[in-house]
From Swiss-Prot:
Gene3D superfamilies: Phosphorylase Kinase, domain 1, Transferase(Phosphotransferase) domain 1. Residues 249-495 form the Protein kinase domain. The keyword Transferase applies. It comes from Arabidopsis thaliana. Pfam families: Pkinase. Residues 141-169 are annotated as: Disordered. This is Wee1-like protein kinase. Induction: By replication blocking agents (hydroxyurea and aphidicolin). It is found in: Nucleus. One of its GO terms (molecular function) is metal ion binding. The active site is at D372 (proton acceptor). Interacts with CDKA-1, but not with CDKB1-1.
């Protein structure tokens, strides 16, 4: 009886010990979990080994051993869950640790902050997904974790190499497609692109027909591109849209006029000097008209500076008109008799002949013929005669069309279209100019007077030496071969009186 009661008492005590053991384990588990959770909150989480934690209920009695042996069954049922809890492998606390219920809300991978003084400015911000540009991508194979570390390292490198090769192949495919598309559209140029290119293209480089050596100046760097957009080239240029003439010059008064142009005395605003600006009276719409008007500019530019030739400075098209900036002279030779009631002396005539002969010699040496020598085209500045108005200038080799000047000063061969001696035409015109200057009155349109002059039949000129009259007859000879050249005229002994 006592043995039976002792067994019953022992069983009750055993059950109570099991309950106490379970309760103590639960308490220790919760304490460890709370401690780790608090350490996580303060960024001081360290690996805590629960195996080294001292137990508060350690007993060495046999009774405790019985209790431990009886609870082994319960430990086997708990399995790996209890062992994991005892080893402290959890780094965070879940709601089921408190309420023993499954947690379906808390995500498995929580991004917990690791410190109290972390600023919000440094926290990562969510970004919108980036669109992938690759055509295809490979999925990384899941490697087995049973292999050694070297195998996993090699497999990861192999995957990276495969991905890089795949990206290279993709880039090559895209590059080939772009190149193919560009090749297909190589021959096509849109009208908008052509118009834009023409607006950005500089004006054309005109060929100067009066320049002998054009090895460098005849090259137009944009010539091969202008053929595509010739219709888009402007017929005139005016800088930034404003009038260059009104912007750069102050017009003073008109000093000359002709059939095709007018000449104004102007003051240049930039340098404060006086110039003569000549511009066409009518608008030049056609390309042939513009090229014809440009002949004077090109001839003056090809000649360059000479003391007995009117200086050339600049030219431009504006409002379909050609503007030429020239040297300003005092007056023309035709105005000389009007300025003085006295007739021109023979010495003054020799000075005029000598200076214009020097100008003609310089022009002829350049391979150019003036073809419009007359009193209106000879100017005087500070007592120096200057030859101007090269609108009818042409080449001596007949490479350019011949346009005759004033018919009153032209020899008969020009009227007969004989252009073999164009330099002698200028000598004839100079003789007629001097004859008109000695006479003191302009030539008339009288048929008889015109025929006598073209035949070289001059009346006597009282008050002048026979030597001068004979020189004039030689210069106005009907046969151009018997006329002196400009060089021969300069060497004539009559000019010895004015030399030195």
């Amino acid at each position: 009886m006592f043995e039976k009661n002792g067994r019953t008492l022992l069983a009750k005590r055993k059950t109570q010990g099991t309950i106490k053991t379970r309760a103590s384990k639960k308490i220790r588990k919760m304490e460890g979990t709370l401690e780790r959770h608090s350490l996580l909150q303060f960024g001081q989480l360290s690996k805590i080994s629960f195996e080294n934690r001292p137990s508060s209920n350690v007993a060495s009695s046999a009774f405790q051993g019985l209790l431990d042996s009886d609870s082994s069954e319960l430990r086997n049922q708990l399995g790996s869950a209890d062992s994991d809890a005892n080893c402290g492998e959890k780094d965070f606390i879940l709601s089921q640790d408190f309420f023993c219920t499954p947690d379906y809300i808390t995500p498995d991978n929580q991004n917990l902050m690791s410190g109290l003084d972390i600023s919000k400015d440094h926290s990562p911000c969510p970004r919108s997904p980036v669109k992938l540009n690759t055509v295809k991508s490979k999925r990384c194979r899941q490697e087995s974790f049973t292999g050694n570390h070297s195998n996993s390292t090699w497999s990861s490198k192999h995957r990276v190499d495969e991905q890089e090769n795949d990206d290279i192949d993709t880039d090559e495919v895209m590059g080939d497609k772009l190149q193919a598309n560009q090749t297909e559209r190589t021959g096509y140029v849109s009208q908008a692109a052509v118009a834009l290119r023409c607006r950005a293209m500089p004006p054309p480089c005109l060929k100067n027909p009066y320049v002998l050596n054009q090895s460098e100046t005849a090259t137009d760097p944009f010539g091969h591109q202008r053929s595509k957009c010739a219709s888009f080239l402007p017929v005139s240029t005016s800088g930034d849209g404003l009038s260059r003439y009104l912007t750069d010059f102050h017009e003073i008064r008109q000093i000359g006029a002709g059939h095709f142009s007018r000449v104004f005395k102007v003051l240049k605003r930039m340098d404060g000097c006086l110039y003569a600006v000549k511009h066409s009276t009518r608008k030049l719409y056609l390309d042939s008209e513009r090229r014809k008007a440009m002949m004077e500019v090109q001839a003056l530019a090809a000649l360059g500076f000479h003391e007995n030739i009117v200086g050339y400075y600049s030219s431009w098209f504006e409002n379909e008109q050609l503007y030429i900036q020239l040297e300003l002279c005092d007056h023309s030779l035709s105005a000389l008799p009007k300025k003085s009631s006295l007739k021109v002396s023979e010495r003054e005539i020799l000075v005029i002949m000598h200076q214009i002969a020097k100008a003609l010699h310089f022009v002829h040496e350049k391979g150019i013929a003036h073809l419009d020598v007359k009193p209106d085209n000879i100017y005087i500045k500070n007592g120096v005669c200057k030859l101007g108005d090269f609108g009818c200038a042409t080449r001596l080799d007949k490479s350019l069309p011949v346009e005759e000047g004033d018919a009153r000063y032209m020899p008969q061969e020009i009227l007969n279209e004989d252009y073999e001696h164009l330099d002698k035409v200028d000598i004839f015109s100079l003789g007629v100019t001097v004859y008109e200057l000695i006479k003191g009155s302009p030539l008339t349109e009288s048929r008889n007077q015109s025929l006598n002059i073209k035949e070289g039949k001059l009346p006597l000129l009282p008050g002048h030496s026979l030597q001068l009259q004979q020189l004039l007859k030689t210069m106005m000879d009907r046969d151009p071969k018997r006329r002196p050249s400009a060089r021969e005229l300069l060497d004539h002994p009559m000019f010895d009186r004015i030399r030195g």
